[in-house]
């Protein structure tokens, strides 16, 4: 049951992101990356539970795969696109780093919280967080 390890990692990243956001112990760019890791792991655990190994590691790639298998809340589409604004994909061209504002981080935390709830509902997991 490899999917459980992805769920556990996602929950750990989630807790770290929430704590760092509330305590202001990390910069917003670091919090963004922790939130992104949580999102990626939550999506991966759902896909793996259904026996589907994600072809892409990006949030938008996994989201497209999730939509093929599940009825995903429509509002997640806008949140995935929002997260992509800050993603620095591998490229030969140098792209400027976009540092999220406190408001951006709040939106990210809101998204990962909603995603967490949806994942736990799909997997019939009782949250301990």
Question: Which role fits each region the language model picked out?
Answer:
Residues 1-129:
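Terminal alpha-helical segments
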């Amino acid at each position: 049951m490899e999917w459980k390890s992805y769920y556990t990692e996602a929950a750990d990243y989630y807790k770290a992101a929430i704590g760092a956001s509330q305590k202001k112990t990390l910069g917003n760019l670091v919090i963004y990356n922790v939130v992104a890791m949580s999102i990626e792991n939550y999506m991966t655990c759902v896909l793996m539970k259904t026996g589907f190994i994600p072809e892409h590691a990006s949030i938008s790639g996994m989201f497209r795969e999730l939509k093929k298998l599940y009825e995903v809340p429509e509002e997640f589409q806008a949140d995935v696109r929002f997260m992509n604004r800050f993603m620095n994909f591998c490229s030969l061209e140098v792209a400027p780093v976009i540092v999220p504002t406190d408001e951006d981080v709040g939106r990210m935390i809101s998204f990962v919280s909603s995603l967490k709830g949806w994942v736990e509902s799909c997997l019939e997991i009782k949250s301990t967080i």
